[in-house]
């Protein structure tokens, strides 16, 4: 891509539009500024805005095959080389308000040595973190270091979420050791979040590994080394995910066993109660048939004697159950 003027990047629909100064900071893009590899420009767009869609359709700075990709809804992380540019789709933990972290958000990037165009449909916190570093003068200096910074920030958020899920699993295990059954759906949600992360972070790890191995002209050897370290760190996170998924399976079995044991214990208790009161139920039914000649019917202490007999009978049955070790 040849050098171009800054006015080609200026439009009202941009979320962020800056030029990297090559020293870790940023400057506004001027209309007469010449954009080159030493000071690449970064344009961040919200692809849901009509102004961004119009700019993508008419700009000559990106290939035709990239326009729809930047404005679309890519599902899985991927990387595609297109001439001197590279199209990359990455996934981020959703840290927006009133959203579940496992409802991952996507960031799509077309990057060359002179131009970085990133798009999103929902806010990506990693973008804001990179922008903050740039405003403080501690950010990336070129296209390669920008991509490494984004990958590192995304992986940091993923690692933190994996650690949070790990802590939740430990809490569930501790509760089960204390014979506490977790609220319904809690384990299912954790397991779903683990599986979603596993589904999308595996290809994302592969994207990072491929970028580190590609001889991209706008990446330096140090950038490739850092990208490989990020891929390795994400790979270790995936191993933790596999272990956590296996632990949730064990937890599910333990919860089922605990609930079955509790149900059996209740059923056993009810059976013992029925056994204790079965003889008394028979006698009360026998003496309550309202027929003439009931024994003790005319005796002044007949009812008291009958109640005492029932108490003795219940006590005798309970003693027998205790002696038989059923109680």
From Swiss-Prot:
GO terms for molecular function: cobalt ion binding; cobalt ion transmembrane transporter activity; magnesium ion binding; magnesium ion transmembrane transporter activity; zinc ion transmembrane transporter activity. The chain crosses the membrane at residues 272-292, 301-321. It holds the Pfam family CorA. InterPro entries: CorA_cytoplasmic_dom, CorA_TM1_TM2, MgTranspt_CorA/ZnTranspt_ZntB, Zn_transp_ZntB. Its main location: membrane. Residues 1-271, 322-327 are cytoplasmic. GO terms for cellular component: plasma membrane. It is a multi-pass membrane protein. It catalyses: Zn(2+)(out) + H(+)(out) = Zn(2+)(in) + H(+)(in). It comes from the Bacteria. It is found in: Cell inner membrane. Zinc transporter. Acts as a Zn(2+):proton symporter, which likely mediates zinc ion uptake. Residues 293-300 are periplasmic. Keywords: Cell inner membrane, Cell membrane, Ion transport, Membrane, Transmembrane, Transmembrane helix, Transport, Zinc. Belongs to the CorA metal ion transporter (MIT) (TC 1.A.35) family. This is Zinc transport protein ZntB.
């Amino acid at each position: 891509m040849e050098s171009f003027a800054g006015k080609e990047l200026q439009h009202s629909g941009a979320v962020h539009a800056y030029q990297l100064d090559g020293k870790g900071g940023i400057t506004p893009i001027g209309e007469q500024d010449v954009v080159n590899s030493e000071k690449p420009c970064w344009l961040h767009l919200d692809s849901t805005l009509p102004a961004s869609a119009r700019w993508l359709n008419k700009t000559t700075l990106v290939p035709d095959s990239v326009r729809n990709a930047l404005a679309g809804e890519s599902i899985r992380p991927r990387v595609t080389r297109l001439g001197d540019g590279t199209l990359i789709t990455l996934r981020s933990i959703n840290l927006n308000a009133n959203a579940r972290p496992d409802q991952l958000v996507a960031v799509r990037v077309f990057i060359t040595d002179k131009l970085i165009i990133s798009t999103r449909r929902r806010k990506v916190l990693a973008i804001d973190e990179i922008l903050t570093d740039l405003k403080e003068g501690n950010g990336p200096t070129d296209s390669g270091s920008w991509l490494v910074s984004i990958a590192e920030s995304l992986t940091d958020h993923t690692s933190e979420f994996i650690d949070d899920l790990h802590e939740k699993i430990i809490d569930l295990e501790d509760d089960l050791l204390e014979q506490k059954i977790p609220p319904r759906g809690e384990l299912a949600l954790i397991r779903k979040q683990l599986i979603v992360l596993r589904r999308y972070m595996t290809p994302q790890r592969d994207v990072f590994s491929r970028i580190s191995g590609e001889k991209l002209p706008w990446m330096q050897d140090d950038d490739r080394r850092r990208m490989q370290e990020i891929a390795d760190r994400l790979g270790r996170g995936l191993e933790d995910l596999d272990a956590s998924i296996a632990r949730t399976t064990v937890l599910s079995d333990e919860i089922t066993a605990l609930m079955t044991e509790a149900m059996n214990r209740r059923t056993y208790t009810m059976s013992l109660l029925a056994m204790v009161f079965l003889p008394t139920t028979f006698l009360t039914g026998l003496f309550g048939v309202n027929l003439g000649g009931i024994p003790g019917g005319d005796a002044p202490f007949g009812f008291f004697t009958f109640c005492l007999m029932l108490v003795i009978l219940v006590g005798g049955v309970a003693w027998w159950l205790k002696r038989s070790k059923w109680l």
